Amino acid sequence: MRINGHGHLLPYPNQIPKFMKDKGIFWLENNQMCQGNWRRPVTDPSFFLDKKLEWMASNHIDKEVILNLSQLYCNGYNRTDTYDVIRFQNDYNASIQHDYPEKFISGFVVQPLYIDDALSEIRRCAVDLKLPLLCLPTHFLNKDNKWTSIADESVIPIFELANELNLAVEIHPYNAEEI
């Protein structure tokens, strides 16, 4: 079996909740990922499900691990927006794994700043959505708006719960001004 251990899927533009574009959080437009004033080209059609499946078939890839979009780690977002965005992203990834279990293993993300919400979301994703992989950024913005390593002691409860639930943990490089 051939497994691609690091893949990303973009939701189609009509799948992204309106509030995310209205608030400048994330949307797709003119073949670009958009976030506030930031733009990044969608460099390959295989970022979308239909083309991803074609790409996997043409490259003889049996299964792919779908990681979360780093644009949606929710650094600097208020608690309500963080909750809504993370829940959207995790539900989207769960739907992919549910609809194509033979093709995808989906990860989910939490924001360590809001530790109680993060722990609840881990339980929801692992138990209710049956997602086996917790995706974490290398660092995140803390309550003082300072970049903090994911290895900080404040994050220990996340790792303890992941261990209790027998989750795989993937730490994804994340670009930030400083760490």
Predicted features along the sequence, with ranges:
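Helix-coil boundary/capping segments in enzymes
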Residues: 1-179
